[in-house]
Structure formats: structure tokens, C-alpha cells
Amino acid sequence: MAGIVIGAIVGSVVSEAVGAVVADAVLGMVIESGITAAAADVLGASLATASFIGGATGLVAGGVASLAVQSVIGSNGPSSAQSAVAAAQAQGILLNSQSNVDPIPVIYGRRRVGGTRVLIEVSGASNEYLHIVVVLAEGPVAAIDNVYLDDLLATDAKFAGLVTVNKHLGTASESADSDLISAVPKWTTECKLANCAYVYVKLKYDSNAFSGLPTITADVRGRTLYDPCDGQTRYSNNAALAVRDYLTNPLYGRGISAANLDDVSFIAAASACDARITSPAFSDTFTADAASDTLTFAQALPIDTGDGIKVSTVATLPTPLTATTTYYAIKSTDTAYQLATSAANAFAGIAVDITSAGVGTHTLTQADYAAYTCDGTVDTNQTAYDNIRALLTACRGMLIFSGGKYRLVLDIATTASSFGFTESNITGSWVISQAGKRVKYNRVTAGFYNPAKKWQPDLAMIESTLLRATDNALILEAKIDLPFTANSYRAQNIGQLTLNQSRYGLVVKFSAFQEGLRCEVGDVVPITHSTPGWSAKLFRILQIEIKDNDEVYVVAREYNASIYTQAVLAPAAVIAESNLPDPFSVPTVTGLTLASGTAELLRLADGSVISRIRVGWTAPSDIYAQKGQIEVQSRIANESAWSP
């Protein structure tokens, strides 16, 4: 069937002579066929816009409406959609803003976010209580896990007795927070914030705990996703299911009817996303707590919920863990995890009941991880076109509108079609183009957000010294944005595939009889022809267009299954946080002694005598505190005010 592509496969290369450039690691692909005005508008692009973006000629020539053109739309550079979405996320996703018009993000998978303050009020006899309401995301979300004040857990001992957090998941039936109604009269029962996931944070003034208004962030498990495989809706970060959710949601997505989706393709894509990839052998030691079923580590780990792990020990493992079993991680905090017996249980939060801490030193080793996940925020201020392309980067996806339905196909190793092009169905002349160095890479740098580094932007770089030598030592680099990838291994894998695919840039353009409509964009087909000397050489279809003479125009790119072989990656490097002391954490003065007697009296020149109290304390062991100042305050008995 025919269609319009509004994106591109990772690393696709089509010569400028072909009329469509798919280059420099454009990552998302949306393909539409059977184009009508309604089908085009559903993604926020008119036919005229799609024609311009795709660089496709004769898009609607000849009045073809029910079966139009398939075309790869890309850019001569990194995807502008990726860059726009990534830039929007980088600007303030971990900050707090204050506005009544800010767009509310949609969270897929797990993400740490800031939010928009919609209320700041004080209460108490001396205004000692501060009340803050921060909207985090479009609701409902699966869970709001940890809340942080200036990157410190709200449950930290530093905030004991000073911080109260109420979490609201943002259901449609959400009620106004009763505690906030009691504390702040202007917050009434009508202030429900329905469909908004938010936190209400109450702070009690303490100059030692707070140096100013803290930045409030939270770890959020985002949207629950419908899975057409079993008809269930549950929390998941499966990239294919996230794309499906965005397409069908009428509030923040495109509101496409489920009847217009080819769920067989979405099920296949979701299964491909869940495929397990053997991970580098990252390991670290842990202690187990039977009371909380938790494994605790000394540092943040590059391990996410759903990752497969194994455990070992020098003595006795915590009961009932065994060394031969693959468990699945449930991430509680950056340094604390629980274990589940399956990936499904991990996402459902069903943890293994640990009944003993074991004996000796225990080690956790990462075993595997899902091929593609979607962990990030959708900026609802961006166009649906840009957001869909950005979502597709998480799974190297192609969204195709064909036969009246949208289908999702991943750019993965694909079995060749039984149908092929030969001299019997290829007509007329054709063009063969080889991509130049502008779209060939020997280095790819992928930008992503790293949970192991408090969700700060990070880079994963893949480089081939062999290819660089082939390229006369020139650095041929592509920079790509992966706004919905939150794992260094996945970012490296996508970067490696981008690099590999760029080296197979041979593109063929030809006309064929209508028999060519037996294949679709995304299919891998063999081409046999004596002119170039090809015998069942494999190509992936990038474009199909019906011509005025009832022939079809085909553009295909060289296909090689070897590019999908997973590279051997090094274990992620864990960078320890600074061990400098917290400048806002002041050690408690100990060993306080008070003495008042004849030795402490002060006799003035006029003969008068002033009574004094000598104060003593144990010198602090902290060298930073030793070089600081200690302030002594006193008050008269039965009075409340202290003075220096």
C-alpha cells in the first residue's frame, strides 16, 4: 500500500539525487498511506506540509487520494523534532516554575521531574509553616515514589519533623487535599486539581534545614498503558505501548480510535521492545534488610526497574534468594532496590519476601535488560508531529498508515519478503546512488537522561577506529538526541546501530509494474537484476508511489542483517558523588558545660561586679566545623526568646 513517511529509520541514508534525504541519524518514522485530509491532519500536518517536508514530488498528482505515495521524510542533519523536544525537556524538567498557563507534561515510564507551583501560602502564629503545591504531570499516573527537596529525600533525617508530603495521582475523581483545606482557607473543596498529578508539601521553618525556597522534584511512574496483547491496562515503560497511548488519547494525544490501529503490529512491536539483551557484567556489593525486603548499595547504580539481575555471596545468601535465579529489579531509590521474580512483577511492585539478611558479603550482577523502553516526558506544548517522532526514537519505530489503519514497525532485523523485484517486473531506467561521507559516520554521540546521575543530561559515544582509518582519519560524527531513552546501554545500542546503518547507504530508485504493491514501506525485499549484477540483494523499501501510468515508483535502501548484531559494551562506570560535607548540615555541639562562681565574676573599674556563666563544649572533630564559628545563645528562665 502507499503512504507518506513523516520521519526516518535510524541512520537511513538516501541520496539527494533520489529526491528524499534521510540522513544524520533521524530517528523517528511515521508513514502514511491511503492519505486523505483527515488522515494527514490527525498527525498535525496538512498534505501540503507533508509534501514539503518529505521532498516528495507528485504527492497527490493525478488525484490519487485512496492510495497515494509512501515517502521517507528526513533532514540533512539531526532530527529537528528530536532536538526541539530534547531542548524543551532540558530547559526545565527538573526545575520549579510558577505559572497558571504552563503546559502540563505527560510522563511515560519512570522519570524524575520538577513541576509548576500553583500555590505558595504561609500559616501559623508566626508564619512558620509554608504550604507548596506542585503539579508534576498529566494524571493519572501509576505512582509518585520519592519526593526530593534540593535533591535530598524528603524523608531524610535532616527534615525530621519539618516536612510533610501528600501525594495525589491525578485521577478524574480527585478530591481536594483535606489537610491543605484545613491549613489554608483559600484552598477550598473545589480546588481538586482533577487529572493533575501533584504533591502538597508542608514545610516548618528551620534555618538549619532550609536556606531558601527548596526545589521540589519527584520520581514519578507515569501513565498506565493499555496492552492489546491481553487487554489489560497497567504501568509499563514499553515504548510501543507508549506510542499507542499517545495516538489514542483524546486529551493530550491525537484521539485516534482503536479501531483505526493495527493492533497485531503493535503487539509484535511491543514484544520486540521486551526482548532481553544480555548486559555487561556490572556488579556491586549490597546489604539486605529482611524488614523492608530491600537491598542497599553504597552508590547509585545504572540499573532500572525491570532489569534482570543475579545475586551471589561468599557465604550465605539472604533467604530465599538463590544464585541460579534471574531476578528483576524494583528501583526504590538511587541506592535501594527490591527484587521480583519476573519483569511483570517488577513493574507491578510485587517484591520477593526476604526473610533473612544472609551472612557474608553479597554481590548483585546485572544480567539483562529490555531492548527498548520509553522513559521521559511529552511536552504538550510541542506539536503531535514532533512528539510522535520523538517517541519513536525510543524504539527505532516506523508508524505506517496503510489500509485505513496505523501500524507500528520497528527497524530491527527483518525476514526478507517472499516477493522480490526482478527484470520481469522492473520497468524502464533506474538510478543507483551511493551515499557520500556527509551521511557516513565513524562516531555517533547520543544524548540521553541518566538516572544514575540524578537524571542529568549525559552522552553515550560509539566510535569505530577501524572505520575512521578507512575514512582517512577524518572524524565523521553524528549527534543524536534520545529524549525518551534513560539508560546508557540502550543509548549506546541505538548509537551503534546508527553508525552501522550509515555505512550501508546504497539506494536504488526504479519503476515497476503494479505487482510492486505486494510489498509495503519497511519491508525487506530481494532485488535481482543483471544490470548491476545483483542476485537477491536485500533492500528495505523506503518509498512507494503510484504513477500516472499505473506503474509504481520505488525507493529502497541497502539492507544488511549484520548491522543489528548487538555490540559488546563495557559495564557502565559509576561515578561516586562528592564526599565534601553538606554546607547546610551543622554538627551538633556536644559536651556542653556551664560554670558560674567566684572565678567567673567580672569586676569593673567602678567596683561593680557582674555575674557570668562560663560555657564549655567538646571541640568538634569535623575540620570544617573547627574553622567555623560557634554561636552561644541564652535566655532568661520562663522567657521564650533566645539572644546571642
Question: Where on the chain are the PLM-derived regions?
Answer:
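Ser/Thr/Gly-rich low-complexity blocks that favor extended beta-strand/coil architectures
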Residues: G139, L149-L152, I303-S332, G516-E551
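Acidic, low-complexity/disordered segments
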Residues: V521-L601
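Recognizes extended acidic, P/S/T-rich segments that occur
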Residues: Q629-P644
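Conserved aromatic anchor
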Residues: R603-Q626
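Surface-exposed, non-catalytic interaction/assembly patches
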Residues: G77-S126, V135, K186-C191, A371-T377, ...
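An acidic/polar, Gly/Ser/Thr-rich interaction patch typically located in mid-to-C-terminal regions
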Residues: A367-G403, R468-E558
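Polar, S/T/G-rich
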Residues: A2-I6, V10, V18, V22, ...
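Small/polar beta-strand repeat architecture
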Residues: P280-A367, D550-S578
